[in-house]
């Protein structure tokens, strides 16, 4: 039996280590960068060690459980634990945050605060993925918004305050519904609050009340995922934020919404999820086609990639709505896959902007010759995004397709229509991505312009791009690496489902 509080250490270490940044000398930018990167690497190694040596893959139950009475007066517990559903997002968080910190190397203004906020965000995200108490989940969910808001409002483009305000209004509005759902579930049927995930999972509710809870949680997670029509904060936010912040937003923040849908809506409220799943699939299909079509019309490079993120999140929603082993496994794989690909595309868009200082695609052109390394990595990762075989995106989308086809919930004709419409969405993806590559890298505009000498990727930027590319290709060739983490937990969720 392992008694060391691994998860508490992993959750609190980044923020407490980040507080030490404020005691560093004022002119120590380089020292602060290296310190932050070392903290992120150490945290990732610590997490990996704990999972490798203390986590059993074939056990679908919660592992590394920690349960401490935190505030006795409110009967509030510090409950942490992981299972096959949360281990993937936690490792993804560690990996992307470490690379985002390395990507933020050029940030010199208020770098002490910048790196502290990144580490605070790291703690909040791991806390959200490992919380086993509804109120603790809500606190971590909210805590993580503060550093995101400050990162958006202090570093970025000219309209950064507008986009940060829009982000906080949307997410705070969604959080009201989340809090109401948490309190409703916690206080239902007893005088004392029962906020434990395990107790709540075994609780049954009147169907009307369960639907109300489901809608509340769905709105909160739809804002974060984002699900249309609550997605409009995302393009503005990505368009203005610094690219290291965009990596965290696209790589981890959006995945928290999808994780919440599975962890709370699907696991705790199965009857309501069974009723709403056809609507989730309809919304997912509309989202894939709408966001892909809208992306094609975007002049702004980062907004085009942001809409592609919205489109790819549609596959996750369809996988969750399919109520099948294959579909849910595909959704979890897409969460991991898009975490890597989305972060990589925003990083490469940011490094391109650092050189040419242009965001509008119709002003670019001919960049392939002066910056061939960026061109090569951008092209390969765009292919991963449009689901080229051999890349993680292809496997994830294909398995979501199989999930819909093999689902027992829907009639054959319905499944054929869903598959056909999804296929149309997949055809639209290469249109906006290949068009983006053509406008940026081909042609003659910038190559023939005066003073058109640009530095290509340095070792740091190449390291970040290749570090993301390796798992994208690795998962594409051997997806069982991700499935081995989640498959038992998915079976447990769905067996509980059909048993009811």
Swiss-Prot record:
GO annotation, biological process: ATP synthesis coupled electron transport
Cellular component GO terms, alphabetical: chloroplast thylakoid membrane
Record flagged with keyword Transmembrane helix: yes
Entry membrane topology: Multi-pass membrane protein
EC number: 7.1.1.-
Pfam families: Proton_antipo_M
Primary localization: plastid
Assigned keywords, A-Z: Chloroplast, Membrane, NAD, NADP, Plastid, Plastoquinone, Quinone, Thylakoid, Translocase, Transmembrane, Transmembrane helix
UniProt feature coiled coil, ranges: none
Reactions it catalyzes: a plastoquinone + NADH + (n+1) H(+)(in) = a plastoquinol + NAD(+) + n H(+)(out); a plastoquinone + NADPH + (n+1) H(+)(in) = a plastoquinol + NADP(+) + n H(+)(out)
GO MF annotations in UniProt: NADH dehydrogenase (ubiquinone) activity; quinone binding
Family that this chain belongs to: Belongs to the complex I subunit 4 family.
Listed PANTHER family: NAD(P)H-QUINONE OXIDOREDUCTASE CHAIN 4, CHLOROPLASTIC (PTHR43507:SF21), NADH-UBIQUINONE OXIDOREDUCTASE CHAIN 4 (PTHR43507)
Descriptive protein name: NAD(P)H-quinone oxidoreductase chain 4, chloroplastic
Organism: Cucumis sativus
